[in-house]
Each structure stands twice: as structure tokens, then as C-alpha cells.
Amino acid sequence: MDVFKQSEVWFVIGSQNLYGPKTLQQVMDNAHQVVNSLNSEAGLPVKLVLKPLVTTPDEITALCREANYDTACIGIMTWLHTFSPAKMWIGGLSILNKPLLQFHTQFNAQIPWETMDMDFMNLNQTAHGGREFGFIGARMRQQHSVITGHWQDKEAHQRIGQWMRVAAAKQESQQLKVARFGDNMREVAVTEGDKVAAQIQFGYSVNAYGIGDLVAVVDAVSKGDIDTLVEEYEATYRFSDAVKLNGDKRENLLDAARIELGMKRFLEQGGFKAFTTNFENLYGLKQLPGLAVQRLMQQGYGFGGEGDWKTAALLRILKVMGTGLKGGTSFMEDYTYNFQPGNDLVVGSHMLEVCPSIAKEEKPLLDVQHLGIGGKADPARLIFSTPAGPALNASLIDMGNRFRLLVNVVDTVEQPHPLPKLPVARAIWQAQPSLATAAEAWIIAGGAHHTVFSQAVGVDELRLYAEMHGIEFLLIDNDTTLPAFKNEIRWNEVYYQLNR
């Protein structure tokens, strides 16, 4: 999934004409060096494109308007090398609808104590030029990101890369289409929500399709395409005896391959990058899509079970953010607990649909086993465990007057004992700060039972994503205490009521 290749971030230098052509030329020469260095040495996921120097209100407004309509541009990164009077930026910032990052840096890392004169001081004015720019953003009540540090600093590089990933995710959100196969699981509350409000807030559209629409595409899949896909399965996974050639569940595997091919074809034809299924809406399908969903998630699609479109969209967004990073991202559900003093654990899984991008095993086991839910034939699925390491669970919920993004930091652990009778993929983790506090805080905040589990994307990216969209962000980690967490929820309630 190469979502960054066609994207770019515009690097914009603001100044004013009173400095004269010589100084302004030096500013642009320095900017060229900074951009070239960042593109070649900083490991950024998205290319920086240096734009012409802007020194007047008309130039700034024209540039912001151009950025809005350029589909390759996912955001603007500004550097106030000199002083740029911020009233000049009001017109441009008032129409800008792309993410904005203020890089508060300067060309020189250290002060040249013995040679510094007023010419040097006039050229290198980031320290107060950046403050002028910051004021107008605050005065206009426009949230923009600020990163401070020298342009050769590794930490600054990392933070710029994070911002780029989130900017790309916002761009993806604006064009994302989510397909719901069937409707919501009956009587379930948290998977419901205001899809119109979500499209206004995030940009993505959510539409439902009768299961018959999918079945028609599935039934049209050819035997040759199925055979080719099964060959891919055989090269990629370990097979149980039941699904090997002449195995008693071989036909179930072929049916699963047909469903995968049909489902992917449907999504591709409609331009969908996320989807949901529901085991209560399976008429015409021979089995609940398990293997198909797992493999589509690994290819970058978002997914939510039981019609959970918010989790499906969020999963796609995190897939975009985490492109190229170590670790995977999956649909997940807190399934059962291990209450043991000093070793409280959570087993996360789902009926079938856990993404192999988080698999510890190089070749997961492909098997067909009974599923007591859905009333269909035994479904195919990949079975694996998850490697130890830091991770998080994220949930997007509709609070009526706002959307809330809830995140719990967790520590994934090695599976402590074999699970010979559990025929599904799973992850096992210790919740921060403890199982008791994390679970109570999650429940108090109304967090969903479905989550996006990620070992690739971190808290900083999700907090920034919430800021870019103007939604509530709540974090449960080692610093969380329940009294403070409850107070934060109360304060947020007041803020979002006043800020409607």
C-alpha cells in the first residue's frame, strides 16, 4: 500500500519586501538547502515541495487557494525565516482547508558569538517571526501544529514525519467511502451513529448495500480465478489437514476464496476502502467472510464487524498512517480477562476477523472450523498469535454532540500458554495503567467493544488526528487516574457544549 507516493507537502516561506532583494534571496537559498536536506536525509514519508517566497497578502491567499484545489498537496509547512507580519496571512488562513504545520526552526543551529552583527540578526528572526505567526492562528481560533527544533535534528524529523502521516490520513478521510454489507447488528448501540455528522466532520461517506448485491458479484467469480487464489494461499500459509487437497473441508476453502474475490471486486468497482459485515445478514453467502476479511485488511482495507462503520473507517485511517512502519494494525475486540494478581491480562480477538499484519508467525495456519454464530457453513480463517511489544487500542464513538476518540496504551505480551482449542487469531496484552483502571475508564468514557489495535501507530499521531478534526481525545495510559479522568470528561462536556 503506497499511499504517500503521489502526495506532497508544500514548504512555504513567509517574509516581507522591506528586507530587500539580497536578504530575500538568501532566505530562499537557505530554504532550498533545508528542503533538499529534509527530502534526502530525514526519512520523511512524503516529499516536500518548496514554493515561491510569499511577501504580500495576495500572494499568500493565492497560494492557500491553490493548495486547497491541488489534490497532490496534503498540507502546508511554513517557516518564518524572517518576520512576516501576520495580518498578511488572515485572508489565506481563513480559506485554507489543508493541515498546517509551523516549523519553528532557524538556519543556524548555534549562535556565532564572535561574528554576529545586525545583518545576521535581521536575517535570522524565527524566534519572534514565529511568535507573530502563532498569534494570528490563535486569534483566528485555527488549530495548527507547531514543531520546534533545528532542521537537522532527528527528533524534529520524526515529528515532521508523524505530522505528514496524519495529514495524509486526513486527506484519505476526506475521500474515503465505506460500504456496509447488510445493516447494523440488531439492538446493538455503540455501532450505530450519525453518518451524516461523520461525513461533515471527517469527510467519509457510509452507505449500505443489500447482501444480494455482494452475492451477485461473488457468484460471478470464475473457477480459474479461484484456483489461482488457492495457489496463492498454499504458498503463503500453512494448511491444516482439513483444507489440503482431498481434505474434508477443502470445499469450504474454495467457497472462502470465491467470497474473497467477489468482495474485493465489489470494493474495487465502487472505490471503497473500508467495509462492514454482519453475521445476521448472510443470505446467499455460504459462510461468514473470515479469511476474506483478514486478507483484505492486510491489503489496507478498513473493516468493522456487525455493521460497525466507525471502526471500519478508523481502521483504514490507521492503515494509512502506519504505511511503511514496523508493526501491524487490525480490527480487534476485548474478549476475555485473566484476573491474576500481578499478571492481569486481556485476550483480544474476534469471531474470525483479525488482520495477519499483526501475526507473529511468518506463515499463519489456514484452517476451517465450526462457528456457532451465523447459521452457515464452517468458515475458513487464519490462526496466529501476536508478537510482544507496545501497542494501543483506539475507539471512535458518537457522543451525540461530538465524536470522541478514546485510546488505551497497552503492552502486548507473548502468549503465556498454548491455546490448542482456540481456533481464532488473538493478541494478549496488559492494559495501562492496570486492567482495573483501564477497564473502568474505558467503560466510563463509553468506549466501544470493537477497537482498532495497532503496533505501528502511536498516541501522538492519534492525538494529532483528533486535533485536525476538532474532536475530543481521551487517553488511558500509565499516567491515568480515575478521578482526573472523570474530571477531564466533565470539563470536556462543558467545552463541547459551549463550542457547538
Curated annotation (Swiss-Prot):
Functional description taken from the UniProt entry: Catalyzes the conversion of L-arabinose to L-ribulose.
Gene Ontology BP terms: L-arabinose catabolic process to xylulose 5-phosphate
NCBIfam families in the cross-refs: PRK02929.1
Quaternary structure and interacting proteins, as annotated: Homohexamer.
Family assignment from sequence similarity: Belongs to the arabinose isomerase family.
Name the record gives this protein: L-arabinose isomerase
Annotated source species: Yersinia pseudotuberculosis serotype O:1b (strain IP 31758)
Pathway info: Carbohydrate degradation; L-arabinose degradation via L-ribulose; D-xylulose 5-phosphate from L-arabinose (bacterial route): step 1/3
Binding site for Mn(2+): 306, 333, 350, 450
Gene Ontology CC: one annotated term: cytosol
Alphabetically ordered keywords of this record: Arabinose catabolism, Carbohydrate metabolism, Isomerase, Manganese, Metal-binding
SS bond list: none
The organism's place on the tree of life at top rank: Bacteria
Cofactor note: Binds 1 Mn(2+) ion per subunit.
InterPro entries noted in UniProt: Ara_Isoase_C, AraA_central, AraA_N, AraA_N_sf, Fuc/Ara_isomerase_C, Fucose_isomerase_N/cen_sf, Lara_isomerase
Gene3D superfamilies cross-referenced by the UniProt entry: 3.40.50.10940
Cofactors required: Mn(2+)
Pfam families, alphabetized: AraA_central, AraA_N, Arabinose_Iso_C
Annotated catalysed reactions: beta-L-arabinopyranose = L-ribulose
Any GO MF annotation of the entry: manganese ion binding
Keyword Cell membrane applies: no
EC identifiers of the protein: 5.3.1.4
PANTHER family assigned: L-ARABINOSE ISOMERASE (PTHR38464:SF1)
